[in-house]
């Protein structure tokens, strides 16, 4: 072990600054302790007060979100949020980002991101039933991007498939702004009975703190601080800040923890995942939530490396570890339970009532600080914000109108854009069927899983078009929530609530912080209008490479409930001669669109204001029509407009369509919001048109083959087979390029 600097040396050399603490924060710690903090204590404060653990820069933003509703059983503040779905059951879900680690070590970064979010779900007492992921990369023409993409996908499928939780959905987009800073956001969904909900608390004087799972190593030390800094190309050496995951160990940990929660409620007090900032974070949070204090004895912590310092043990982010609080005297029983799963459980401390966090090592006290100072009292900053220069420039631009010579060729080109193209090559590597509950496979608007023992099903999706947020963070934020809800509704489900991963640049730059601040207003407004509170989430700031920030990317994960499995709907046209309807009006919405990107090579301009009331009305009508059994298929209109939505609806069952739209050709590719493509059996035509009224435009019918779309001044005409092949092969073709 190295000789640790003395408190005086730490202060004089400003060592704390290397760990991310400012001078003001260091002085605040001195005031709290009434002395200079020692080496270990300085380390504890530096991670617990990092943005990643304390949300010190984003708390004022998060206050904007609605977090309550009649269906919400647990909002933000625990491992994950919980929503009631009736029948004594609830759904538990949360999303997490693992962006910085995945940029450095893409396979392990993505795999441990999946592992961490799964632990958050089962620490609540829920059985994880599904994984989704939201990924962002640079352009696939770049060799390093292809490597990152391949490894991240392999890491997600490697972990998810081994632990036996199906990866059922997600979304992937490619933009130059993610070149040096990919985004890897993972979402996990679990099921729980109301009477088995578990909280992460450590209370009751003398009760024991048990450490369970994998041994502690030196991996991931300062991972939380690493995630709270900007990225520079030189940082690819920071591999020790990336952890290595073991999905087989996690599978045992999952079963053991659920066994403990289900069958030993009498002795279990609290349970929490050791995630960011490892042991210090989980133990301090558990004590702080319960208003208790703690004593930890580090000599008892299972270690897989020799001569680890207290600092290293407390900050290690080794994977597959949980912290459990149990009744005094029950330690042996818990250890034996974990032994039956081949896992180690060790008592490493106890609960006190004095509110102090005391850590012993080698018979000496190495840290003695107030619990709340670590977990609750990090400073909160109201950052300065100002509208970016580009917004003023956008206001001066005339709206972009595409020039189209051949609509058929344009549709083919759009279908091959990586953001629109089929992601089949990705989701085929995921096991989406393990557990055998998956009813709607990846590739439709939302994934759907049935809830065993009931007639219900759950729909889930992740969504965000960051181009819209780049043009207008507030409207873009509204659209992200609205599109997620549209996907849930198109699958026949009632939207319940959201989780979010807020991926942004540095909060220290007023223009970046303005993006976070204003997009939160948009997200909050849409959540209120659509009745989907924010029940959990994660903030990932400092997503910049060499000073260039990513587009603002608030990934919205949404879950909805389908009361009766007979109402499950997919985007695929079902039968020849079914009628095709367009719900919602089409306007000249080309700014931020896929066609603008193709024709200009960039996106620019303003977004038209977005009518949330109309969005809500259209969603309610479509859901009603689905629930009364009048709809054969439903698909939301998104990137690429009506033309792409129609083509996608034809692909799954390789059918065709004959459609006539009273629009000029460019409008076939407009990305106006609040629109759906529905197909309806001719026998339901009258009932459907009576129910939907003027909102529905009957535009054509499903045919055996061929995509034929008539605009006022052009016709799209191509074979379904050819178009589908272009759409399916686009990403595999790009991946085969040589560097």
From Swiss-Prot:
GO terms for biological process: 'de novo' IMP biosynthetic process. Mg(2+) 2 binds at residues 120, 273. The active site is at 52, 98 (proton acceptor). It catalyses: N(2)-formyl-N(1)-(5-phospho-beta-D-ribosyl)glycinamide + L-glutamine + ATP + H2O = 2-formamido-N(1)-(5-O-phospho-beta-D-ribosyl)acetamidine + L-glutamate + ADP + phosphate + H(+). It is an enzyme of class 6 (ligase). The keyword Transferase does not apply. Substrate binds at residues 97-100, 119, 243, 317-319, 540. It holds the Pfam family AIRS_C. InterPro entries: PRibForGlyAmidine_synth_PurL (IPR010074), PurL_linker (IPR041609), PurM-like_C_dom (IPR010918), PurM-like_C_sf (IPR036676), PurM-like_N (IPR016188), PurM-like_N_sf (IPR036921). Mg(2+) 1 binds at residues 96, 538. GO terms for cellular component: cytoplasm. Its main location: cytoplasm. Keywords: ATP-binding, Cytoplasm, Ligase, Magnesium, Metal-binding, Nucleotide-binding, Purine biosynthesis. ATP binds at residues 55, 94, 500, 537. Its EC number is 6.3.5.3. It is found in: Cytoplasm. One of its GO terms (molecular function) is magnesium ion binding. Part of the phosphoribosylformylglycinamidine synthase complex involved in the purines biosynthetic pathway. Catalyzes the ATP-dependent conversion of formylglycinamide ribonucleotide (FGAR) and glutamine to yield formylglycinamidine ribonucleotide (FGAM) and glutamate. The FGAM synthase complex is composed of three subunits. PurQ produces an ammonia molecule by converting glutamine to glutamate. PurL transfers the ammonia molecule to FGAR to form FGAM in an ATP-dependent manner. NCBIfam families: FGAM_synth_II, PRK01213.1. HAMAP family: PurL_2. This is Phosphoribosylformylglycinamidine synthase subunit PurL. It comes from Enterococcus faecalis (strain ATCC 700802 / V583). The lineage of its organism: Bacteria, Bacillati, Bacillota, Bacilli, Lactobacillales. The gene is purL.
